[in-house]
């Protein structure tokens, strides 16, 4: 009788424990229901609604642009105004959270300005066909996708209509500094870039960045956006790629985000952001001569290097 009582008690405890576990799991999953319902309630954006672009993008203007992300009253961008022209390379610099990536996303129409206007060739970006605009822009963000495809497919996926253009493919691989990466793969361009596949391999972050840069360049565009695509590369590789970019994209508008002093000097103009505001703009020489916030950012990079050099000498 005691054994039966003990066994029954164990079963009851087990059932209670299982019930509590299931209840806790249900509660955790219920927390996501509100987000799921919000997703269901979202209206699908009509990317083909608006005026199509009939001319290449020659100018981009931000006119008193403010932006705050959904569910927050804090502005990520505040009263930002500037004009960009084609045939120039622009660099964005600022501390983390200063609004650099946000600015690029607004340009891609991933978000709408809270206040102010963005003009493309003098036309309000909100009046322009979204799909047509994005076809003219090639971008690589920090969280770029690493497709479980072949190396070739990872590059040509940005422009499937010209995926068989082997000359263009070879050129962008060289421009992105990815030739050494491809040559080191067991099946070169036909290598699967994910372990688990027959003959597949996994790349380092720096190698992936070069593949992603080649992907961005394979799509011939009016505007090229690079959001810190060189973070895992050494300074020499970054300078080499930017120099090649300047040659390849000389008829376009190129914008890149970087924190490296050596690469900033290769830009025609630099936009300096601080806490969401555009505080300075000009060439590297002009900004250095002004001796303001840009100079502080550069000095913060150079001083540790000088200190290490002094330690080496001792």
Predicted regions and their residues:
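Pre-NBD coupling/linker segments of ABC/ABC-like ATPases
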Residues: 40-55, 287
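ABC-type nucleotide-binding domain
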Residues: 53-314
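Cytosolic ends of transmembrane helices, especially the final helix of ABC transmembrane type-1 domains
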Residues: 5, 10-40
């Amino acid at each position: 009788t005691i054994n039966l009582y003990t066994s029954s008690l164990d079963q009851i405890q087990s059932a209670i424990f299982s019930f509590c576990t299931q209840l806790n799991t249900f509660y955790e999953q219920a927390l996501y229901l509100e987000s799921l319902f919000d997703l269901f309630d979202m209206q699908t954006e009509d990317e083909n609604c608006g005026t199509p672009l009939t001319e290449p993008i020659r100018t981009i203007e931000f006119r008193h642009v403010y932006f705050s992300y959904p569910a927050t009253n804090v502005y990520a961008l505040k009263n930002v105004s500037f004009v960009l022209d084609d045939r120039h390379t622009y660099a964005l610099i600022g501390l983390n959270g200063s609004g650099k990536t946000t600015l690029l996303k607004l340009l891609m129409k991933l978000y709408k300005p809270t206040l102010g206007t963005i003009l493309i060739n003098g036309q309000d970006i909100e009046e322009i066909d979204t799909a047509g605009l994005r076809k003219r822009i090639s971008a690589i963000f920090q969280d770029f996708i690493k497709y479980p495809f072949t190396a070739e497919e990872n590059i040509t996926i940005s422009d499937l209509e010209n995926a068989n253009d082997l000359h263009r493919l070879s050129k962008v691989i060289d421009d992105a500094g990815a030739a050494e990466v491809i040559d080191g793969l067991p099946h070169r361009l036909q290598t699967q870039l994910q372990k688990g596949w027959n003959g597949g391999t996994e790349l380092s972050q720096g190698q992936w960045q070069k593949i992603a840069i080649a992907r961005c360049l394979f799509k011939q565009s009016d505007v090229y956006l690079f959001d810190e695509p060189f973070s895992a590369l050494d300074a020499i590789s970054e300078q080499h790629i930017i120099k090649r970019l300047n040659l390849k994209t000389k008829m376009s508008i190129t914008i890149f985000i970087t924190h490296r002093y050596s690469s900033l000097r290769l830009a025609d103009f630099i936009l300096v952001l601080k806490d969401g505001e555009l505080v300075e703009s000009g060439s590297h020489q002009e900004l250095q001569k002004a001796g303001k916030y840009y100079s502080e950012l550069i000095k913060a990079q150079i001083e540790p290097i000088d200190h290490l050099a002094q330690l080496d000498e001792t």
